[in-house]
């Protein structure tokens, strides 16, 4: 199947400035992400950046790059600009991979594109089971709840669903004894969309729920669209948000 991967790569990260160019095993981080996207079988891979040094690095390893505005409020707005500039057809499948995911498994890149095509929705994504109590209660871990057919009911940083009886009985001191049931899933931040839908998305105003949770995908649900979720065939390793994350990834890739 045909699909295009777009990799937004912002240089001005608040927690780790310049991270697309951070050296990992002799290559800039953005090159590792690009290579994983290439291995997925994508028809086309484009790096979207607002910084000339990142663009120069991408051209240096023969990657395709699209320069974008530095004024975007979200990664989705950056995607919309790329789609407009490259005149991508409305029915083209677009997979969005974050530029700080150098360990993303290529198999899940193709999986999310197939998920979109199979279920005939405008947006699809992936999740993995939560099996750790600390992860469940961590607000930096986004939880996703679906119906019986895998369509999203809600995304939240809070624990959903709330297991009233078990949580009340155990209390905070005994959370380690929780029996995590099969409905707890961690959302993986990889998306597939139709190009035309991305253009529609950026026409919608930000919504109350997305501003409260700081989760822009809630804008899709707010406007009545469906998102389909599948369990990822392979759980992705750590992304790079901090210096500590970067060192972990360097350690992993130094042994490959």
UniProtKB/Swiss-Prot annotation:
Domain of life: Bacteria
Keywords: Cytoplasm, Lipopolysaccharide biosynthesis, Nucleotidyltransferase, Transferase
CDD domains the record matches: CMP-KDO-Synthetase
One Pfam family here: CTP_transf_3
Broad class of enzyme this protein falls into: transferase
Pathway: Nucleotide-sugar biosynthesis; CMP-3-deoxy-D-manno-octulosonate biosynthesis; CMP-3-deoxy-D-manno-octulosonate from 3-deoxy-D-manno-octulosonate and CTP: step 1/1; Bacterial outer membrane biogenesis; lipopolysaccharide biosynthesis
Family: Belongs to the KdsB family.
Protein name in the entry: 3-deoxy-manno-octulosonate cytidylyltransferase
Source organism (scientific name): Histophilus somni (strain 2336) (Haemophilus somnus)
């Amino acid at each position: 199947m045909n699909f295009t991967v777009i990799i937004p790569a912002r240089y001005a990260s608040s927690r780790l400035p310049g991270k697309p160019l951070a050296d990992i095993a002799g290559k800039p981080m953005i090159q590792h992400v690009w290579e994983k996207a290439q291995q997925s079988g994508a028809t086309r891979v484009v790096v979207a950046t607002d910084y000339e040094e990142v663009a120069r690095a991408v051209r240096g390893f023969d990657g395709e790059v699209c320069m974008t505005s530095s004024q975007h409020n979200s990664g989705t707005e950056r995607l919309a600009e790329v789609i407009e500039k490259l005149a991508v057809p409305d029915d083209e499948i677009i997979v969005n991979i974050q530029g700080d995911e150098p360990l993303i498994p290529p198999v899940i890149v193709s999986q999310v594109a197939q998920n979109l095509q199979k279920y005939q929705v405008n947006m699809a994504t992936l999740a993995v089971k939560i099996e750790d109590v600390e992860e469940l209660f961590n607000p930096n871990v986004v939880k996703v709840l679906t119906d019986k057919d895998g369509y999203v009911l809600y995304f939240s940083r809070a624990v959903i669903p709330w297991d009233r009886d078990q949580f009340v009985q155990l209390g905070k001191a005994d959370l380690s004894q929780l029996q995590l049931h099969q409905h707890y899933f961690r959302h993986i931040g990889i998306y597939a969309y139709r190009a035309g839908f991305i253009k529609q998305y950026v026409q919608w105003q930000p919504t109350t729920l997305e501003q409260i949770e700081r989760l822009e995908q809630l804008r899709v649900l707010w406007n009545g669209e469906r998102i389909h979720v599948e369990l990822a065939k392979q759980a992705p390793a750590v992304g790079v948000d901090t210096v500590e994350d970067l060192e972990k990834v360097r350690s992993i890739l130094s042994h490959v």
